[in-house]
């Protein structure tokens, strides 16, 4: 299975936000087909604060709005985003699998509040939202993390994408899609990480 054209635009969107490539965002928005941006675009934008921080996410929202807008939100998008602890916990377990307990423990050792915020905000409130399939969310995370050369987290989310249903070929295609946005060294390193951590058991 290969990435569809819509998925290609999403991973490119995610990488461009992470890198602060505002002209790339303008091009993406202005060349979007009829029906896009849609909720999937908006979900990628919203989750980007987890990977790129609020400053770039806010700037990306402004750039996309000025370039043509983000479409009309569905009513359920605007419901109060109450966290779903159960949903977030299940998602965390699916992404990290047998390493989930060790990852939680490492976060706790770093700072207990960091572990709590990641569980309650990143997973329960943001990544467990409807509007974008979990495996597509992970592919967009792969794009953002590869763009920023965050190897350890790239490895985790590349594996997570496969565990959630993406194919290994799709994870590799993410890198091909964003290749021109990365430096040659960053691209080569990302390819090595993805090849190693998504190989067949």
Please place each PLM-identified region on the residue numbering.
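Preference for long, well-ordered alpha-helical segments
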Residues: 144, 150-153, 158, 168-189
């Amino acid at each position: 299975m290969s990435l569809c054209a819509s998925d290609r635009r999403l991973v490119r969107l995610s990488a461009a936000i992470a890198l602060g490539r505002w002209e790339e965002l303008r091009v993406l928005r202005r060349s979007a087909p009829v029906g896009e941006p849609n909720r999937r675009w908006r979900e990628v934008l919203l989750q980007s604060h987890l990977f790129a921080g609020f400053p770039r996410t806010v700037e990306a929202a402004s750039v996309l709005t000025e370039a043509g807008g983000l479409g009309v939100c569905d009513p359920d998008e605007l419901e109060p985003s109450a966290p779903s602890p159960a949903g977030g916990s299940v998602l965390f377990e699916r992404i990290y699998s047998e390493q989930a307990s060790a990852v939680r423990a490492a976060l706790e050792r770093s700072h207990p509040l960091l572990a709590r915020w990641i569980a309650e905000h990143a997973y329960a409130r943001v990544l467990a939202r409807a509007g974008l399939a979990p495996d597509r969310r992970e592919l967009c995370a792969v794009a953002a993390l590869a763009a920023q050369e965050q190897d350890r987290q790239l490895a985790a989310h590349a594996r997570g994408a496969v565990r959630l249903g993406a194919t290994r070929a799709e994870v590799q295609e993410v890198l091909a899609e964003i290749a021109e946005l990365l430096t040659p060294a960053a691209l080569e390193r990302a390819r090595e990480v993805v090849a190693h951590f998504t190989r067949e058991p």
